[in-house]
Amino acid sequence: MKPTAETAGAETELAVRGLEKRFGDEFDLPGVDFEVGADEIVALLGPSGCGKTTILRCIAGVETPDAGEIVVGDDLVQSADTSKPPEKRDVGMVYQNYAVWPHKTVYENVVFPLKHADHDVPRGEYERHVEEVLELVEIRELKNSPATDLSGGQQQRTALARSLVHDPDLLLMDEPLSNLDRGLRKNMRYELQRLHHELDVSLLYVTHDQEEAFYLADRVLIMNDGEIVERGRPRQLYDRPASPFTRRFVGERNRFRGTVEETPDGDRVVRTPVVDFRLETVDYVDDDGGDGDVVCFVRPADVSVGRFGHGGPGVLELDGTVVAEGLLGEHYEVTVSFGDASLVVHTKSGREFDRGDEIPLYFRPEDIQVYGAPDE
């Protein structure tokens, strides 16, 4: 497992401390702290408007924070007394819209940082550096092409080459794949991983796409309303989300409320509108150990439908009515109603269900997670 900057002894490439930014009377960032380690990919993941891009712009030097410190490598680039311009910061940046100049060729776009940024590349070496980075992103043959002739994927690679040409130790990426179609996004995720491993560059990646963040990142920082509400490795955040917001935002989960009661035999049982079950049999419990309200989660993929269900000891069985259904890529999504409650089910079966069908469902209590309700 790769060490991270927020573990003891790890080398840090980026440190953000107490970062604040106001727009008018409102805080966009009320005080943000995090680190990115050397050769680490960290994703800032959150909904639109949560402050992700503002953080990136402050690090790049195109936005001035109201308070806080930013350290890139060993260089203090932002503080109460210091504010270095973008060209004096050892960072590369890829914008969401790529910012490829339409009146320039690919070469002229990519060479720009060498002409204007703070680096040690002699003028006579510019062309070699550009050709090397174009080869790296696999568009060397487009070197003299006008930017207006480029496809979306080629523009993205041009912007990536421009961000890498001066060999930065830190690369900032702001929703770089959001304008590409699904096939290109998948290919570029692979390309970004390849480049990261070849160049040993640290990467701070902003996205609202959970799939991108979890595929690429060593660590993910979950943001909401200008704050980092949770941080951790992708598997940890997916399997054991600690904050109420993360549980709602990450992955797909059925969510239903219940009440914990103690039986005469001393067992703690959860009563819900969907199904009742013993608390000791579930996958994960985070409550105060007493009776009271709880919130329960089960993933759509963990619920089996119809004859494809697997009954047996301890399996929870229930019947409901199909209220919505449809094919979503590689699986069917079926919404099943139980009076005032419902469950969303994902099945790979070729069977299609019609609205109004009565169908049985099965799932194991080991697939349920239970959390205390007050913070939900």
Where are the regions a protein language model picked out?
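Short, conserved post-Walker A segment of ABC-type ATPase nucleotide-binding domains
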Residues: 42, 53-62
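ABC ATPase nucleotide-binding domain
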Residues: 15, 35, 71, 352, ...
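Conserved ABC transporter NBD signature motif
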Residues: 68-79
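Non-catalytic connector elements of ABC transporters
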Residues: 2, 253, 264-376
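ABC ATPase nucleotide-binding domains
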Residues: 92, 96, 100, 105-248
